[in-house]
């Protein structure tokens, strides 16, 4: 799968097809651009897409040719910083905040909670200075993904 390119874009009226790929719910544009990949149920997934103004169309998923994340300028900076964390390594919310020129580790956590491309933008590698921190998809999953990377099973 192509690596994620973190870039801004307007999703209103974006036509997407929804399906499952590698155990994740995915949304792919008709031109083959993966715009959302989450470990979530399809009903929640479709609601999120529609709230962004996407039009969900029927049909088979096209081949994924590109990956693009959509978010605010700040979110994009945070997600880009996450992509620089190597598999099996972690960084603290505070370290990411410093990297992106922000004083608030909490703001970084909020940006990570909006990550639309789970694993491809590896927000699970960002931890609290005092422990694992939060994770939109649950701490059990975060710990498993980190351990799999440390064990060389993912990456």
Regions found by a protein language model. Give the residues of each.
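…primarily DNA-binding HTH/wHTH and HhH modules…
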Residues: 130-155
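Basic nucleic-acid-binding alpha-helical/helix-turn surface characteristic of O6-alkylguanine DNA
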Residues: 1-103, 152-155
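Helix-turn-helix DNA-binding helix
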Residues: 107-108
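Generic, ordered loop/turn and secondary-structure boundary motif
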Residues: 12, 68, 75, 127, ...
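Major-groove DNA-recognition helix of helix-turn-helix-type DNA-binding domains
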Residues: 111-120
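Residue-level signal for inorganic ion chemistry
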Residues: 82, 96, 123-124, 145
């Amino acid at each position: 799968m192509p690596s994620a390119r973190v870039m801004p874009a307007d999703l209103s009226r974006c036509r997407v097809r929804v399906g499952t790929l590698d155990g994740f719910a995915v949304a792919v544009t008709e031109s083959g651009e993966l715009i959302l990949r989450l470990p979530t149920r399809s009903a929640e997934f479709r609601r999120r897409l529609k709230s962004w103004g996407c039009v969900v169309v029927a049909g088979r998923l096209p081949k994924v040719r590109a990956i693009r994340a959509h978010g605010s300028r700040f979110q994009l900076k945070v997600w880009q910083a996450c992509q620089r964390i190597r598999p099996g390594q972690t960084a603290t919310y505070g370290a990411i905040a410093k990297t992106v020129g922000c004083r608030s580790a909490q703001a970084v956590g909020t940006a990570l909670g909006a990550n639309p491309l789970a694993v491809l933008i590896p927000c699970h590698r960002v931890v609290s200075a005092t422990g694992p921190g939060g994770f939109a998809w649950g701490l059990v999953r975060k710990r498993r993904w980190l351990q799999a990377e440390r064990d060389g099973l993912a990456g």
